[in-house]
Every structure is written in structure tokens, then in C-alpha cells.
Amino acid sequence: MSGNTFGTLFTVTTFGESHGPAIGCVIDGCPPGMVLSEADIQFDLDRRKPGTSRHVTQRQESDTVEILSGVFEGKTTGTPIALLIRNEDQRSKDYGNITETFRPGHADYTYWHKYGIRDPRGGGRSSARLTAPVVGAAAIAKKWLLEQYGTTFKGCMSQLGEIAIPFESWEHVPNNPFFSANASILPQLEAYMDDLRKNGDSCGARIDVVAENVPIGLGEPIYDKLDAEIAYALMGINAVKGVEIGAGFKSVAQKGTEHGDELTPDGFASNNAGGVLGGISTGQNITASMAIKPTSSIRTARHSIDKDGHPIMVETFGRHDPCVGIRATPIAEAMLALVLMDHALRHRAQCGDVKVSPPPIPASSR
């Protein structure tokens, strides 16, 4: 397989490049009969799209989605759903100086050695532009999961560069370009980003994502454990270099008396497991975090080599996000939704008739 398809029963195959005519995806396995329109998909695409603030790339893309197939008279038919998003604001001349060189931290070097050819315009297939159709596909998954189980998704940025962002309220997240759950820290974040751009540099970020009202039983041990699939999905997002589930690396310093989530008739007393035990969802919130590296495309000159192996200095021009993490929250939600959608269908197919006693306890005792 060439690595362009995600999922087992609910599959998403993406296509296109950053500076091609269009990008898109084909979704297979969506159950029939669900009411669906472009408006159901556009909301999340608008949350992810570029050009929405001075702190992200100024490439102006409307990211307007077109449904080409799989929907008839406003309902899904159970056949493949094709989504198309046309590229409208390519500026390929910005990449003329890197066609024969390799940008440090980018996929240029590895794509060249793997395929023997590469598209240097905006990173081609390796561009984060290709997360747009993924977000579109996940909007369909989110809608189905909400209607079937009441499952909802939310995320926020919890760190920008060196600045930790204390959590205040989810209510703040939709009201700022950073997806920050803290309103008072916004001036500091804006000043930090302005300094980065002025100095021709970039930074990383940490994104937290949560799924609520997740049914118990999702996950396929041993090799398709739910937390393993979530980690796999989040690591597949551009620039992600680390993933935590639940307490994550904090688990190292915890004692067993602290880490193990106690069960009571009223619910779980804590959620260090992040909603997954033995690779199977517990019915608690699924919680995960991901670390995003600094953007590799910066205006500061860096050492590299050209295709002939000669030493050179590389400066990257063009319109780039000084922190790709600023627009990553909807993408993290999307990948989590695709995992849960796929596993919901897999669980329903094999274990949909299973009933045990006692019934599941509440997600939380608090």
C-alpha cells in the first residue's frame, strides 16, 4: 500500500498537492441514510483554513468544499463520498530558489531519495494543506458519532513555544486565533508571535484534544488497540513529534496508588488512562495531547546541501505559518474523530449484540 488511505471500515483516501488544481478525498464506508450537506462539512474547514489572522500563513484559500458523490437528495447513500476543495491562491514562484536544494527539517530530502522526484511547490504532497480534506472527512464522522452516541470533540492549544497556557474555560477557544482556553494570556501570545515573525523564526506548540460521550468497548486488541490507533493517527499529522494519551509521560512519576483509576458505583474517580484500558474505551472522556515541532520554513539562513551534495545556505520565502500548531486543533479533533468512527463501525459489526451485567458505570463520579 502507498500510505494514502486511513481506516479499516470507514476509510479516507486523500489526493492532491499544495499547489495543484485541487485537493480532496474519497470516503468509503459511511453508513447510508444520514442527512448531509456541504454546510455540515464547511464549519470545521473554516476553523482550519489559512489567512484568518496575522499569525498564520496569509495564503487566501476559501476551502469551499464540493460533494461530488455519495449523497442523493440530501442523504448519504452508503457509496463512496468524494470531496473536492479547489486551490485558489497558489504562488509557486516563491519556491523557485529551492528546486535544487533541500530545506532543513522538511520532507524535501526524504521525498527525493524515496521517489527520485519531488514537487517543491509548497511541499507538494507533504504539505499541511492536505489536512483540509481530512478535516472535511472527519466532519462527516463527527456528525454520525454525534447522532448515534452523542459523542462530541473539542481541543485547545495548551502551550505556544515556551509559553504554557493555563486552562480557564472551553468558552474562550472559539473566540481567538490560537484556540486558547485562556483569554488573559492572549496579548502575551500575540507579542510572542510578532517577535518570531520579525526575527524570521518559528516555534512549536502543544495541542490537547478531548472526545466526550464515547461508548464503551471501542478498540481491537491486540494490535489495533484504541490508544495505539489514536497515537498513530495523531502522529500522522504534519509536524507532530510526540503524543500523550491520558497522563502520558507524567505516568512515569506517578505511583500505582495514584495512577490507577478507581471504579465506584457512581463512576470512575479519575482518568489517568485517558479513557482507554487494555486498548478498549472505558466510556470516559478520551484525552490526548500532541507536540508540534517548529515550522521548518523560516527566513533565517540555514546550512544544507543541494542535489549534487554541495554545501549551501537556504532561506525559505513564501507564505508560511510561523507556528503550524495555531491551526492544528481542528486537525487533531479530525484524526481523533476518524479513529472513533472507524472503531465504532468495527465494534458494531463484531460485538454490537453483546450485553453484560452490570451496565457501564458513569464516566466520572464527580
UniProtKB/Swiss-Prot annotation:
NCBIfam families: aroC (TIGR00033), PRK05382.1 (NF003793). This reaction introduces a second double bond into the aromatic ring system. Pathway: Metabolic intermediate biosynthesis; chorismate biosynthesis; chorismate from D-erythrose 4-phosphate and phosphoenolpyruvate: step 7/7. Homotetramer. InterPro entries: Chorismate_synth, Chorismate_synth_AroC_sf, Chorismate_synthase_CS. Keywords: Amino-acid biosynthesis, Aromatic amino acid biosynthesis, FAD, Flavoprotein, FMN, Lyase, NADP. It catalyses: 5-O-(1-carboxyvinyl)-3-phosphoshikimate = chorismate + phosphate. PANTHER family: CHORISMATE SYNTHASE. This is Chorismate synthase. One of its GO terms (molecular function) is FMN binding. One of its GO terms (biological process) is amino acid biosynthetic process. HAMAP family: Chorismate_synth (MF_00300).
